[in-house]
Amino acid sequence: RYIDSFFRPFLKGIFLDDPEQVSASMFRFVFRAFSAGDAAIPAAGMSALPKAMRQALKPGTVITGVQVVHVDRHEVRSADGNQWTAKQVLVSAAHERLTGQNIPELNKSWRSVLNFYFEAKTNPIKRPILCLNANPNALIGNFCFISDVASTYAPQGRHLLSCTHVGEASWTETLQHQVHAEMAGLLSLPYDALIPLKHYAITQALPAQQRVSPEPRLLQTENGIWLAGDALANSALNAALATGRLAAEDMLRV
């Protein structure tokens, strides 16, 4: 009973997959992490993490909001015609599309998710906790009044509610209404007590975790482009950071 009421919905929200389909080593990693520390979010939003890393770099070093259309060993070109040259190039996302090469070691199976955000006039939970829905037929797997975790996420007197629908990331107005109604029912609130704000359909949210690499894999394509990212190891920020760091260390040795 405890497995079905806690572990199954909890782990499904983490891995975006049925726990039976996930490597046992990833379960041990996640369980150890949650046992050793507290779950937290940055007060300024998740973008605060890369922004903090960028602050250590010279102004102009990091360029965002640019669509990259071509990458080779020493050059990167963008859709607006700009190009940058470098001694070496590293790709950490959309590896095959950007390099134009087949990469057998890459995890090409992805799990998707839909996130819904609502403004709530009242908060029946009143605690900074993640609420799990153990009903296997429910649309909502988990939810949280995220402004209870970080008060900066909502204006004073209002509450930001986040809920997750694991599965095909295909949003429709019908699904929006169904999730809205189910969420109101779970909280015993009237439908109009929740105001839809935004939804995010993420088709490639996490790489599948049936088999994971115990150690981050360092790879170069045939034409010498370096590769990094969680799809080369496991679906955790740790893996994304570790593959990037190890690749950078190897690049400096060349």
Placement of each model-derived feature along the sequence:
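Aromatic-acidic/polar surface patches that form glycan- and anion
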Residues: P42-M46, Q101, N107, T172, ...
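Conserved flavin/dinucleotide-binding core of flavoenzymes
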Residues: I146, T152-V254
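Short, hydrophobic alpha-helical segments
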Residues: L57, W84-T85, L90, A248-V254
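Active-site/ligand-binding neighborhood in enzyme catalytic cores
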Residues: R1-E75, A86
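Mid-domain catalytic core of redox enzymes
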Residues: V69-Q176, G185-L186
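PAPS/PAP-binding and catalytic site of the sulfotransferase fold
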Residues: L49-A56, L90, V179-G185
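A structural signal for the hydrophobic beta-strands that form the central parallel beta-sheet
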Residues: V62-T64, V91, L227
